């Protein structure tokens, strides 16, 4: 008969026993830190939206901020719309912002299409011609004007600081509430901020900010595609002779490769030309497919707020992105705000379909509603 071995129910005497009175609480649990976190969680909990204006309602932001000329009844009526904006800014959890040049005007950088914008200062042609690829690189005089504009914008933006609106977006991104900023701006004020940084060239992981039209902060070779910080000293801006500058400067990296190939007895492959890394009309967007992929992925998220700000949406591709996001946000019972200094054209609002509130005035004032 085989003897069965039974393991002892109690551990052997050599096992270390802990006293029953020992405190077994999680050592990482710090009650004094936990309580403020719980309070913050309760405070940030999204309350129920009690008021929604009719679609395409208009709110005069400047008049509301400077309410000295408003009657008591007018102020009371506008308080509801102001509360609606405040709700969107304070409680939205997954926001998409599509911005234009209007958000940088307060920093000292002019916009493009207003009565005092960049396009209005162009002599001998339309302002749009300065951003047309065929005109800029098909006519020497237009190339000079384009260089003047790019160098001027670069130096101006270098001496400007992000605005209160930029700072507000940076805070949204810091708090994890900004899904994406799609910016049409080339001044780079937004990407100076730590939580609105981007990748140049655009690459994964997808950054907080997607630059739809490039940036004046960089230049690129059309041949080797080498990207460098923009150097204004390379670009000729007038008719005066200067051996250090060219209207369309040659790429130093390509020239170096050519020198090496020549010394090695290899045939020439040509030297590329440098240009500001700004996307122009009538050229293929080098990152267009990737931006479309990012937008399509963002559309799959549960976006609860779309803010269109500082843009007239004249560019069809940008208007189409806004239209798709507006439909998605509306389906999610979110909020769509359109902030601009002037009333958007009816055809733009009809295309977007689901704008809850058109906020007229200086977008910097909206930060007072936080």
Curated annotation (Swiss-Prot):
An example Gene Ontology cellular component term from the record? cytoplasm
Instruction: Name the SUPFAM superfamilies for this protein.
Output: DHS-like NAD/FAD-binding domain
Q: How is the cofactor bound?
A: Binds 1 zinc ion per subunit.
Q: Which residues cross the membrane?
A: none
Q: Which residues are the active-site ones?
A: 213 (proton acceptor)
Q: What biological processes does GO assign it?
A: DNA-templated transcription; mRNA transcription; negative regulation of transcription by RNA polymerase II; pericentric heterochromatin formation; rDNA heterochromatin formation; replication-born double-strand break repair via sister chromatid exchange; short-chain fatty acid metabolic process; subtelomeric heterochromatin formation
Question: Which InterPro entries has this protein been placed in?
Answer: DHS-like_NAD/FAD-binding_dom, NAD-dep_sirtuin_deacylases, Sirtuin, Sirtuin_cat_small_dom_sf, Ssirtuin_cat_dom
- Primary role: NAD-dependent histone deacetylase, which contributes together with HST3 to histone H3 'Lys-56' deacetylation, regulation of telomeric silencing, proper cell cycle progression, DNA damage control, DNA recombination, and genomic maintenance.
Q: Which PANTHER family match?
A: NAD-DEPENDENT HISTONE DEACETYLASE HST4, NAD-DEPENDENT PROTEIN DEACYLASE SIRTUIN-5, MITOCHONDRIAL-RELATED
The Swiss-Prot or TrEMBL record describes its family as follows: Belongs to the sirtuin family. Class I subfamily.
Q: What is this protein called?
A: NAD-dependent histone deacetylase HST4
User: What is the organism of origin for this protein?
Assistant: Saccharomyces cerevisiae (strain ATCC 204508 / S288c) (Baker's yeast)
């Amino acid at each position: 008969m085989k003897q069965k071995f039974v393991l002892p129910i109690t551990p052997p005497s050599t096992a270390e026993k802990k006293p029953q009175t020992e405190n077994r609480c999680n050592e990482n649990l710090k009650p004094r830190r936990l309580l403020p976190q719980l309070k913050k969680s309760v405070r940030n909990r999204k309350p129920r939206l009690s008021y929604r204006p009719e679609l395409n309602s208009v709110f005069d932001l400047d008049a509301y901020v400077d309410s000295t000329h408003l009657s008591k009844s007018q102020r009371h009526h506008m308080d509801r719309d102001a509360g609606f904006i405040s709700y969107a800014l304070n409680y939205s959890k997954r926001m998409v912002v599509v911005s234009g040049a209007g958000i940088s005007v307060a920093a000292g950088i002019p916009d493009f299409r207003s009565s005092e914008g960049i396009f209005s200062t162009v002599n001998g042609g339309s302002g749009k011609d300065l951003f047309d690829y065929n005109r800029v690189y098909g006519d020497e005089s237009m190339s000079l004007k384009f260089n003047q504009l790019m160098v001027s914008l670069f130096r101006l933006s270098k001496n400007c600081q992000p605005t209160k609106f930029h700072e507000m977006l940076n805070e949204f991104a810091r708090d994890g509430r900004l899904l994406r900023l799609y910016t049409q701006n080339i001044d780079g004020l937004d990407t100076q901020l730590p939580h609105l940084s981007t990748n140049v060239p655009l690459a994964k992981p997808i950054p907080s900010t997607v630059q739809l039209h490039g940036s004046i902060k960089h230049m690129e070779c059309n041949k080797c595609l080498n990207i460098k910080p923009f150097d204004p000293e390379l670009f000729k801006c007038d008719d005066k002779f200067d051996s250090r500058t060219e209207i369309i400067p040659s790429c130093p990296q390509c020239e170096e490769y050519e020198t090496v190939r020549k010394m090695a007895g290899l045939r020439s492959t040509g030297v590329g030309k440098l240009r500001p890394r700004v996307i122009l009309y009538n050229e293929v967007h080098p990152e267009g497919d990737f931006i479309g992929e990012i937008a399509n992925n963002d559309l799959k998220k549960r976006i609860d707020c779309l803010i269109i700000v500082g843009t007239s949406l004249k560019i069809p591709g940008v208007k189409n992105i806004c239209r798709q996001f507006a439909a998605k946000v509306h389906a999610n019972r979110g909020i769509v705000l359109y902030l601009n200094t002037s009333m958007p054209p009816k055809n733009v609002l009809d295309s977007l379909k689901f704008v809850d509130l058109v906020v007229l005035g200086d977008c910097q004032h909206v930060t007072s509603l936080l």
